[in-house]
Amino acid sequence: LVELIRKAHDKGIKVMLDLVAGHTSDKHPWFLQSAQDSNLQYSDYYIWSDRLPDAKAEKDLEAMLKSPDYMQSTIGKWMKSEYPRDKYYMKNFYACQPSLNYGYANPDPNHPWEQGVNEPGPKAVRQELKDILAFWYGKGVDGFRVDMASSLVKNDKDKKEILNLWREIREWSDKNFPDHVLMAEWGSPKYCLAAGYNVDMDLNNTRAHNRRMYFDRKHQADGGSYFSLNGGQPSVKDLYGNAWPENKVDSKTTPAQMLKEYYDYFTDCVESTRTMGYFASITGNHDHLRINTGARNTPEQLKVMMTWVMTMPLPILYY
């Protein structure tokens, strides 16, 4: 990788890495030690409890464990522990992805597993994050795209603590590693850029707006950017190959209305953050359908979509 970075720099190409800041593998040494006891170096790097917080968590865990591939299930927030420590640990998405403990913005005193953001465990995790960034900056990396950057601090509805966390990282990064770029998978530039990021990305799952433009599962259609010489929109299948339920199809909204809704949303995001950074248009990612899905797969259709992407302030092309 260092050799790749060097050769890229020789050609004037910058290199960014993807940073998954919210979880580790359940095979990671930090987690394996944390799973042994509550008084070890990495014990509070993760969130453990001897009970589930409520009936919903119990129901979710029961449903998840019934699945034959439950380790790949995104149901619920807790996983049953098979380790010497407490009965349950908090997962980020899948059970094999235990959530790192960045703390709770508003910890509930009745939930002893909820630590404040300035308690020793969360503070140590923040330092580890800085150490990881410093390591790769030292190898010549020019910046990072941060996975689910808004999700690190728990119970943070007004985003106060996650903004504080990333502002701290930004200040530290600028002081020690100037001229580096931070890009977030956030999907809300008014928060993201205020947190110190240079770039936020328009996501396919944010307020349903991106789907209006690219591919609209709710409307069982190809999105407002699809045009049909015969009028209307062809039906396509959703991300998983299954038809969207008929009772969720909103046939009253026209492609033109969908396009205007997206345009109004996107331009508001751009105009309100113009002096803060960039709100990027993307052609796809690992969670996002490529723009040539379904009927939008001809040169004529793709020219329309790519005209939008390439005209906006910062296009991101997914290869």
Where are these regions (language model features)?
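Aromatic/hydrophobic pocket-lining residues that form the small-molecule binding cavity
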Residues: L1, L129, I162, W166, ...
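Conserved alpha/beta catalytic core and glycan-binding cleft of carbohydrate-active enzymes
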Residues: D26, F31-K66, R170-Y319
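Short, acidic/polar
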Residues: P120-K139, P299-W308
